[in-house]
Amino acid sequence: LVAAAVALHLYTDWRKPIFLNKVEAEQNEIKRSIRLFKRRTDSLLGFLRTKKPIIIDINNGEQFSLEYQEIMTDLLDITDDLFTLLDNYKIILNENVHNHHIKFINKNSESLEKIFDVIGKFDPVIYYSLSFNLVYAELQKEEYSLLLREVIVNFPDGLTTFYKHISQ
């Protein structure tokens, strides 16, 4: 019986560092992806603030549309990667033990999904004009700045807080 208790203790001590390493690795990937998301979002917002399309630039293939399409395509790719990372991260968490953190992840995934619903509604290359008009109008709203703040600022802070909590 004592041997079983010692074995269980050693097994538990051995598993915790592996779990912490997995969490840390996944969180680092998520944070890296969030930084890329922030850069591309800043690029998009800066682009929308500083550049105004001339009537001829509304046509697909003009310099303005090409810049917009490049920014949007990168932003959509990064957002898709971030969704994948979040799904993979939730797999390593135990629903019974980390339920609060999983709810936090889901809340941020929902914020990201609301952003994606706007930026991904129309293909920025094929339906450039529709995409531009929708994104320009929607990102002016206060709701989207709050969603972006949630994903870009509060989400990484919550990940760090969770890691500090489980590593103690």
Task: Give, region by region, the residue ranges found by the protein language model.
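Membrane-embedded hydrophobic alpha-helical segments
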Residues: L1-P17
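Alpha-helix boundary/capping and short turn/kink residues
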Residues: A4, L20-V23, H98
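Amphipathic, soluble alpha-helical interaction motifs
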Residues: A4, P17, R40-S43, F47, ...
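Generic structural signal for well-ordered, non-membrane alpha-helices
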Residues: V6-H9, R32-R35, R39-D42, G46, ...
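Amphipathic, membrane-active segments
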Residues: T12-D57
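Short, solvent-exposed segments of well-ordered alpha helices
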Residues: P17, N21-N28, L66-Q69, T73-L76, ...
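A solvent-exposed, charged loop/short amphipathic helix patch at secondary-structure junctions
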Residues: K52-Q69
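An amphipathic alpha-helical interaction surface
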Residues: E70-Q168
